A protein has these predicted regions:
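Structural core segment of the AMP-binding/adenylate-forming
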Residues: 15-16, 58-59, 86-164, 175
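Conserved AMP-binding/adenylate-forming core of the ANL superfamily
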Residues: 28-74, 78-82, 99-104, 160-161
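Conserved adenylate-forming
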Residues: 56-61, 166-178, 183-225, 237, ...
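ATP-dependent adenylate-forming carboxylate-activation enzymes
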Residues: 71-72, 89-107, 119-124, 247-268, ...
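AMP-binding/adenylate-forming catalytic core of the ANL superfamily
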Residues: 98, 104-105, 115-119, 273, ...
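Conserved AMP-binding/adenylation subdomain of ANL enzymes
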Residues: 204-223, 231-271, 286, 337
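Gly/Ser/Thr-rich phosphate-binding loop
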Residues: 244, 267-275, 285-355, 368, ...
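Conserved beta-loop-beta connector loops within the AMP-binding
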Residues: 363-390, 410, 427-429
Length: 474
């Protein structure tokens, strides 16, 4: 017997329309590549997203056609997230830090039909546009006045001209929630990059999971600064979670130096920020050099690589900011675990609490995980034995785009598991600790040695800004 609840598809268009209706005056603030600060509301963002959808219809793009971006975090990129996916196409975020030949390969492999780019990336686009054979429309994310007179790119149009000719009246289509919504390619350290193709369903469920109190804890009372780029795994899903909860969004654009990030945090009363350790290192150095303090920042999410214990201590003891140590990967949309102390930890001394906080945390609801030995046997959650980390869940890939690399999963009696390539321990409370990447771990004197542990020891020295440990045969 089935339940008698309405079967409403989980679609990304529903997020932006919910935000426009229920959080209509919620702010979205962006530092633009032009240097000024732009601000508007969720209601205005929704209207402009509909203009994007109409512009794509006018181009004749089919359902599931790919629309690529080469862009920083900003309001126009935000509009593309919703206008592209909401209209049934797929937003494909390309990492502009890749080599031009990799960008060409990715764009052609994805069969991108439109490519939208920030003007700071015009030199890259000039180098690749003639080789991107499937792209029929190039769009510069600026107004007509900011578009250079002679770009050398055939048919290039300014974004504001492109959507300015369209109506903001648009009826979002209804379709299968399992339809593709976004595409992001892995780094391709072992060959060509492979695409992770996210669905509407997986993206909405990921937004639900990420907004939970024991995950990122987003709410309408927050002002959120995603420093993690929108071209990398959808900025960890924060734009979707913010629309779901009505949180104020603050986009930093291209200015990611410590001074610029600090000024934006203070000016926009940011309460929650998210980024990789290198960004926070620059911020902390700037603050220390100038004797600065935070007036509103409460929490910062640190992921992308293991957070050094010294950074957690500095944020907590010097600035009163709680670090949420998180872990995930492109193939996981990306959120897997977030570290929050449990009630029983609150009475522990500082050293005992730090032993918990340096871990990557517990699984967000929706993510299942286990560690296995080389023969595939599951290992106990004792916090001591390490093994290969496997995961499964509704926002974790089942295969790569176009089947690249074959079947990536491991299949056993418990289901289909994605091998993360990480080596980890899990303690009895479910706290995950990544001890290494399986390809980085060092064996010396018959013992396995964690490069992460060695790096953290080095970074703890006040004279060391950052460190990387490499194994060298001898």
């Amino acid at each position: 017997m089935l339940g008698l609840m309405q079967d409403q598809p989980l679609l990304i268009s529903g997020l932006i329309e919910f935000a426009a209706r229920h959080h209509h005056d919620g702010e979205i603030v962006s530092r633009r590549v032009e240097g000024d600060v732009h601000r508007y509301t969720y209601r205005e963002a929704a209207a402009r997203s509909r203009r994007v959808a109409n512009a794509l219809d006018r181009l004749g793009l089919a359902f599931s056609d790919r629309v690529a971006t080469l862009a920083w975090n900003g309001y126009r990129h935000f509009e593309l997230y919703f206008g592209v996916a909401g209209s049934g196409r797929v937003v494909h975020t390309i990492n502009p830090r890749l080599a031009p030949e990799q960008i060409v390969w990715i764009a052609n492999h994805a069969e991108d039909r439109v490519l939208c780019f920030d003007t700071t990336f015009l030199p890259i686009v000039r180098a690749v546009w003639s080789k991107c054979t499937t792209v029929k429309q190039w769009v510069a994310l600026c107004d007509g006045a900011a578009l250079p007179a002679d770009t050398g790119i055939d048919g290039l149009v300014a974004y504001e001209d492109w959507i300015g000719a369209e109506s903001d009246a648009y009826r979002w289509p209804t379709f299968d929630e399992r339809s593709a919504a976004a595409l992001c390619y892995t780094s391709g350290t072992t060959g060509n990059p492979k695409g992770a193709l996210y669905s509407h369903r997986s993206t909405i469920l990921h937004a639900y999971g990420g907004a939970l109190p024991d995950a990122l804890g987003m709410s309408a009372r927050d002002s959120i600064l995603p420093v993690v780029p929108m071209f990398h795994v959808n900025a960890w899903g924060i734009p979707y979670g913010a629309a779901m909860t009505g949180a104020k969004l603050v986009f930093p654009g291209a200015a990611l130096d410590g001074k610029s990030v600090y000024e934006l945090i203070e000016a926009e009363k940011v309460t929650l920020a998210a980024g990789v350790p290198t960004v926070w290192l620059g911020l902390l150095n700037h603050m220390e050099q100038h004797g600065l303090r935070f007036s509103t920042l409460q929490r910062t999410v640190i992921g992308g690589s293991a957070c050094p214990p010294a950074m957690i201590t500095t944020f907590k003891d010097r600035y009163g900011v709680t670090v949420l140590h998180a872990w995930g990967m492109t193939e996981m949309s990306p959120l897997g675990t977030v570290c929050h102390l449990k009630n029983k930890h609150l009475g522990l001394d500082e050293a005992a609490q730090m032993a918990v906080l340096v871990k990557q945390g517990r699984a967000v609801y929706g993510v299942e995980m286990k560690i296995v030995d080389p023969e595939g046997r599951e290992l106990p959650w004792d916090g001591r034995q390490s093994g290969d980390l496997l995961v499964k869940g509704p926002w974790i890939i089942s295969s790569y785009f176009k089947g690249e690399g074959g079947d990536p999963l491991r299949h056993d009696a418990d289901g289909d598991w994605f091998p993360t390539g990480d080596v980890a321990t899990i303690d009895p409370d479910g706290f995950l600790q990544i001890t290494d990447r399986s390809k980085d771990v060092i064996k010396s004197g018959g013992e396995w040695i964690s490069t992460i542990d060695l790096e953290n020891l080095a970074i703890a020295h006040p004279a060391v800004a950052n460190a990387a440990v490499l194994g060298v045969p001898h």
